Every structure is written in structure tokens, then in C-alpha cells.
UniProtKB/Swiss-Prot annotation:
The keyword Metal-binding applies. This is ADP-sugar pyrophosphatase. It comes from Homo sapiens. Disulfide bonds: none annotated. The lineage of its organism: Eukaryota, Metazoa, Chordata, Craniata, Vertebrata. Induction: Overexpressed in cancer patients with a poor outcome.
Amino acid sequence: MESQEPTESSQNGKQYIISEELISEGKWVKLEKTTYMDPTGKTRTWESVKRTTRKEQTADGVAVIPVLQRTLHYECIVLVKQFRPPMGGYCIEFPAGLIDDGETPEAAALRELEEETGYKGDIAECSPAVCMDPGLSNCTIHIVTVTINGDDAENARPKPKPGDGEFVEVISLPKNDLLQRLDALVAEEHLTVDARVYSYALALKHANAKPFEVPFLKF
């Protein structure tokens, strides 16, 4: 990004926003030129993408980690596969969506889960607002873990309720073999896995790899 020569040094080397200039705006996103002060007192600019739908002091949306639990079955993670025009292909993702006006993250998570997968669940936990791609956008989400009672009659034959223009395929993969199953889908179908999904699968693998073994480091 662009930079200018130092002006007055910023107080205590703290970086801060000076101004934001709108470059272009569409229905869902806008492009801005952000001018800020770096720790040395230089004025710099950054191209930033922001959602037009953001509400004050709330995250933009939610991503749902749906854990499907059934008697005598391994736990499964419910994912969605859909075509993403910016990627030019199909992606595997957690069910996700924007938070509506007056809606809590928990309510948005349950709504999006039912709309995209047909499943009804219960909230297990909700993260604080976390950033998505801070080098590009200010977009934030809550990551909400939801448990699904697969033995419940209402979840026996789930029927998604996609919105206009949404075409979603529901995929359930075993939690204890998630990373390997994702890798197999990538190899077979040449699709892309959302970074949140792949990071979750990696974390499961790392957590299950000799969890009680004390590492021995060589110096």
C-alpha cells in the first residue's frame, strides 16, 4: 500500500485511522481507501472492503459448527457445498449467514442452520466476534457451535429452506475422520475447503495426536 513521509510522530507509536474514503459501492459490499498512521509517524493508505449491511456494534454474521449426534453412530459435522462465483468453483463450508436486524448471534445461527441444512439444534457455545480476513476486510463473525439430536423426529428427514438464489448441498462427515475425508473430497471433486473448516479439521487431528504425551525437546 501507499505511504508518505513522516509527519508528526503518532503518540506512543500507536497506529490509528485518519480517514476513510469511499471508492465504489455495490448492493452488498463497498471499497474504501483507508488512510492511517503507522508507528513511525508515516501516513499510509490501504484498500479496504466492507459490507454495506453491517449494523452498529455487531458482527456481520455467524458461522455454525453443527455436531450431529445419533445413538450408536459416530458424531458427524454437517457441512454445505455450494458454488462460489468469486472462487469460480465449489466450496465446502460451515453453514453461515448474516445477522438480521434485532437478531442475536445464537438466533441467527439456529436460523441459518435450519435454512441451509434443515436441521434443528441447540446452542452449545458462541464465540466473541472474530475477524475473517483482516488484511482485506473488516468483516467479523461469531462462531457458534450447535448440537443436533439426530434421534429427534424433527431431524429424521431434514428439509433445507434455501433463500432465493441459494443452491446448497448438505454433506455430513465423521468428526473423527474429518481431515482425511475433506482431503479425499478435494482430490476427487477439485473443490476448495473454507479455511475455517480446514482449520477445525486440523485442530481435531492435532488434539487427538498423542494428547497425553509430554514432548521431549532437544537443545
